[in-house]
Regions:
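Catalytic loop of short-chain dehydrogenase/reductase
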Residues: 1, 12, 27-65, 76
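A short helix-coil junction within the Rossmann-fold of NAD(P)-dependent oxidoreductases
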Residues: 17-26, 64
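C-terminal helical subdomain
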Residues: 67, 71-74, 79, 87-128
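Short-chain dehydrogenase/reductase
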Residues: 15, 57, 101-104
Length: 128
């Protein structure tokens, strides 16, 4: 229940509260995960909560066509959370969290249409 409160209900409620104050073209960015589309043993709650968040973003994009609604997957990273999720796996070859920053900046300042994106796969500056 807590994972859904944090990953689905809180972002949805916050968005509902600020939605009336947005101007056309405003952006809403949700942080998702590949666990929303890939099945990882033991990750049912987390993965399904991120899948629900992806759906929130998709429906909001249809309901609010004058806004840009994004679900952004920052990608696999060398973090404590990732290491704890995969104990015994060597994750030293994973990029640091900062590797996602250029893609996230593209979402925030570029001209991409609403949708779900993997931050590290975005061609930075390509849509300008």
């Amino acid at each position: 229940r807590e994972v859904y409160s944090v990953n689905v209900f809180a972002p949805l409620r916050l968005t509902q509260l600020v939605l009336p104050h947005f101007r056309p073209g405003a952006r809403v960015v949700f942080v998702t995960s590949d666990a929303s589309v890939e099945a990882y043993e033991g990750w049912g709650g987390y993965g399904s909560s991120k899948a629900a968040l992806d759906q929130v973003a998709a429906v909001l994009a249809v309901e609010q066509p004058n806004l840009r609604i994004y679900a952004v997957d920052p990608g696999d990273m060398n973090t404590r959370m990732h290491q704890e999720a995969f104990p015994g796996e060597d994750i030293s070859d994973r990029p640091p969290p900062e590797a996602s920053v250029p893609g996230v900046r593209e979402i925030i300042s570029g001209h991409l249409p609403s949708g779900r994106y993997q931050a590290r796969n975005l061609p930075v500056g390509a849509d300008r």
